[in-house]
A protein has these predicted regions:
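Short beta-strand-centered aromatic/proline hotspots
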Residues: 39-55
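Short coil-to-beta transition motif at edge beta-strands of beta-rich domains
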Residues: 18-40
Length: 90
């Protein structure tokens, strides 16, 4: 039996298991769920999958998705027009 495990690695080094592989450069929430685009607002915590590594051993593989925290300013390009938050205001 071959076992595949998938993890997200937060910028501070914490690791959390996720149910499956995440595409490179995808936006995800704190639980590793892919965010639907366009985003409703830029006032949210979102990460970008910045790097992916896979470690294979006999009978198993571990895939690590390294995340990068996105700023509110960076998220503006992913938001519906007309509903953005800048400096804490809509």
């Amino acid at each position: 039996m071959f076992m595949e495990e998938f993890f997200i690695v937060f910028p501070e080094g914490d690791i959390q298991e996720v149910p499956g592989r995440l595409p490179f450069n995808t936006l995800v929430d704190m639980n590793g769920n892919v965010l639907s685009l366009p985003l409703p607002t830029n006032k949210m915590i979102a990460f970008r999958v910045a790097r992916i590594t896979t470690s294979e051993k006999k009978g198993s593989s571990e895939t690590f998705h390294f995340l990068e925290l996105m700023s509110a300013e960076e998220l503006l390009s992913y938001v519906k027009s007309g509903r953005t938050v800048v400096d804490g205001r809509f």
